[in-house]
Amino acid sequence: MKSSSFYHGLLFFFSMAISSMALAQQDSTARLGLPGDNLNLAAVLDVFRQSPTLESFESALNADTSKINNLDLNNDGKVDYIKVVDRPEENIHTIVLQVDLNEKETQDVAVIFVQKEGDNVKIQMIGDEDLYGKNYILEPAEATTATETTN
């Protein structure tokens, strides 16, 4: 009987471990029921990391072929163009992704912080609270894809 309970315990442990791994690897395209559902920030961060310049990043982000951007924040039935605005200050670049709602108003979509510390570069993206909810933060993993922390 001892070995039977040992195997049951082992089976329970492995099933719990597999369940938690499955939860940890949830699809990064999970819908939040917010306007930001039409722009996958994990995909945006991957495009950012692959782009040699901010201009090429903006072009890739808005290319019809990329299928990343499907935002329509001004409800005109057209996909909004996302502007990339860089605000450098010392060793930190604050890169703001914005959409023009009309001629006078813009809506920030997300902010990418890039900080250089010696030979290391830290990148963090924060989705706008109105579009993604509170504390929607992404940081690139050591691999080539981004990890995200949602609400």
Regions found by a protein language model. Give the residues of each.
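N-terminal low-complexity segments enriched in Gly/Pro/Tyr/Ser
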Residues: Q25-N151
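Bacterial Sec-dependent N-terminal signal peptides
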Residues: M1-D27
